[in-house]
UniProtKB/Swiss-Prot annotation:
Signal peptide: none annotated. This is Mitochondrial import inner membrane translocase subunit Tim8. GO terms for biological process: mitochondrion organization; protein transport. Belongs to the small Tim family. Heterohexamer; composed of 3 copies of ddp-1/tim-8 and 3 copies of tin-13/tim-13, named soluble 70 kDa complex. Associates with the TIM22 complex, whose core is composed of tim-22. Its main location: mitochondrion. GO terms for molecular function: metal ion binding. The twin CX3C motif contains 4 conserved Cys residues that form 2 disulfide bonds in the mitochondrial intermembrane space. However, during the transit of ddp-1/tim-8 from cytoplasm into mitochondrion, the Cys residues probably coordinate zinc, thereby preventing folding and allowing its transfer across mitochondrial outer membrane.
């Protein structure tokens, strides 16, 4: 196949985008697992959440959002888009 083939180029672009999405999803799962381990030391949520646990979860979620925004901006720049 010719490398200038537009269908091939489109396919390769879609493949790259899907690979990036998969890596992002794996990252989210990893971070979620880490936050769970940090915030719930006994691996199960308590019947009533105390202030310390609530703060831990809030901070963790905020860091995940920050990481997500960073990754979206980075992927957008890689694809030639604007953030």
């Amino acid at each position: 196949m010719d490398s200038a083939d537009p269908q091939l180029a489109r396919f390769l672009h879609q493949l790259q985008a899907e690979t990036q999405r998969q890596k992002f999803t794996e990252q989210v799962h990893t971070l979620t697992g880490r936050c769970w381990d940090v915030c719930f030391s006994d691996y199960r949520p308590p019947s009533k959440m105390d202030g310390k646990t609530q703060t831990c979860i809030q901070n963790c979620v905020n860091r995940m959002i920050d990481a997500s925004n960073f990754m979206v901006e980075h992927l957008s720049k890689m694809n030639g888009g604007s953030a």
